[in-house]
């Protein structure tokens, strides 16, 4: 089978964009191609990413024998990315706690008894200080997170965040913020400030979503992503693995992302850190609950890399729970970004020195800011 993959890689088929412009005809042609080749070989043969994946195609790829799947993902990664580069991101919590949402996993929800108190938003000078430290340590994207449901009625906060974004950009760092739901006007304000990317995760599959969150719909999340992309900001959207979901939910999660047009610029993969006092931690304490296996993480990453080849795939929260060998295999499966520094909002994060040593051992170097456009 691998010889077939190599053969199709060397004789890549015409890009989908060269087919008929009618969307229905494109979809039919793509389905025919995939049927002839098999989903994995079809994905590897494309000159441009497809945005019309079916769940059956994704399931076929996801359940490819693991060694073959990982190898295919590495082939795809090397086809679309510089395999020696890794994007280093640092995240700062600029407004902690007090969120009105009921996300079962989150320490910052006011509905969860985690002992985390709501705090006011930090000052601009504090952000600049943290961004300078991140830059000294090699990070090229600086991310700001605030525990809010949305930005309604937060005009003064928006002005301060715009100032933060502009000043961090002036330091030569890319900027990303996660502020909850934003409308088109708010997205435009962030774009005008120079924002590089906006993070808004879909968390899981549409089918599993309501078992985790009820105060914000799946379509609410998709609308925010649409608002962001239409404003000209890159979308950073991924999810959390380990929420009691099934492997079909991993496939459904990838299905949503891979059918976006354009695909997310970056795709963070979080491994759940079960926090005491959250409903999710209580559910997972049940011996009968569904526990996430490492091979499921690997399959999710590899499948995402194969069907969203241009995206930056980022190991995010929970990476500190992985052994170095596990992280290494994730990079072999297509990861090319990490969060590094002091903290991931309310959970631990691998430190800069630790990560520098690990990446140097692997022969990886930081991506330069503003010079890695895969759109």
Swiss-Prot record:
CDD domains named in the record: Radical_SAM
Known pathway: Cofactor biosynthesis; biotin biosynthesis; biotin from 7,8-diaminononanoate: step 2/2
GO cellular component: mitochondrion
Cofactor(s) it depends on: [4Fe-4S] cluster; [2Fe-2S] cluster
Enzyme class: transferase
UniProt record, GO biological process: biotin biosynthetic process
Signal sequence bounds: none
Record HAMAP family: BioB
Miscellaneous remark of the record: Present with 504 molecules/cell in log phase SD medium.
Protein's recorded name: Biotin synthase, mitochondrial
